[in-house]
């Protein structure tokens, strides 16, 4: 990449990372203040718009990997972003009955803390060329608590939404139809739950390996 191309890339990624960082900072602020003032039942209504913005913006990270803007493997990025988009739009937005559950609060707090750390880390690297050691440690250590709480909340909310999927038949396609094809959203969601069984340990193991590599590299520098 040429000097000009590299500068444009860094500028774009800096703006992207800081914009999404501020989106997640809003989510965390609204989640915590609403939890303290009104209780967990009101949290989703308070965070809905910034949550949808911040999480949907993450779709661009898949494109970043595909076109070579970042070195993150798409095979690692796609499942995580895909599952979060599914929760954001396929569960929370689609089934309001889930909004008052305590798991919504644990979900958005787990996600937002994780992403505030991650986007500030990459924002610092793209903007200034480095990130402080404490931020690097947070980037590669907090997942050991926040990943299990986030995943548990995701699985729980999908499970909670299943009866409403079956009752409303939302996003279902029944036979007969001109495509000669049927689709049941509740069965697809059950399948997604099954994917969490091997997928979650795999991702956790991958992140542990990334942590070991990143902290060893920082120590040697």
From Swiss-Prot:
The keyword Lipid metabolism is annotated on this UniProt entry: yes
Reactions catalysed: a very-long-chain (3R)-3-hydroxyacyl-CoA = a very-long-chain (2E)-enoyl-CoA + H2O
GO cellular component terms given for this protein: endoplasmic reticulum membrane
Record's subcellular location: Endoplasmic reticulum membrane
Segments on the Lumenal side according to the record's topology features: 33-51, 96-100, 166-184
Membrane topology annotation: Multi-pass membrane protein
Any one Gene Ontology molecular-function term assigned to this protein's record: 3-hydroxyacyl-CoA dehydratase activity
Family note: Belongs to the very long-chain fatty acids dehydratase HACD family.
Protein name, per record: Very-long-chain (3R)-3-hydroxyacyl-CoA dehydratase PASTICCINO 2B
């Amino acid at each position: 990449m040429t000097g000009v191309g590299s500068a444009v890339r860094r500028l774009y990624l800096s703006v992207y990372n800081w914009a999404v960082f501020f989106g997640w900072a809003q989510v965390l602020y609204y989640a915590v203040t609403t939890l303290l003032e009104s209780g967990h039942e009101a949290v989703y209504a308070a965070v809905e718009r910034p949550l949808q913005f911040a999480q949907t913006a993450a779709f661009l990270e898949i494109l970043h990997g595909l076109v070579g803007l970042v070195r993150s493997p798409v095979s690692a990025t796609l499942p995580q972003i895909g599952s979060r988009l599914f929760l954001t739009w396929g569960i929370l937005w689609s089934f309001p009955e889930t909004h008052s559950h305590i798991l919504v609060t644990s979900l958005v707090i787990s996600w937002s803390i994780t992403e505030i750390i991650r986007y500030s880390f990459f924002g610092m690297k793209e903007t200034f060329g480095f990130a402080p050691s404490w931020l690097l440690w947070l980037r590669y250590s907090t997942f050991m608590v926040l990943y299990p709480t986030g995943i548990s909340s995701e699985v729980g909310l999908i499970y909670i939404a299943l009866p409403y999927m079956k009752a409303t038949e939302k996003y279902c396609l029944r036979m007969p139809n001109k495509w000669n094809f049927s689709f049941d959203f509740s069965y697809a969601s059950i399948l997604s739950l099954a994917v969490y069984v091997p997928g979650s340990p795999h991702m956790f193991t991958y992140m542990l390996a990334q942590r070991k590599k990143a902290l060893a590299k920082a120590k040697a520098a």
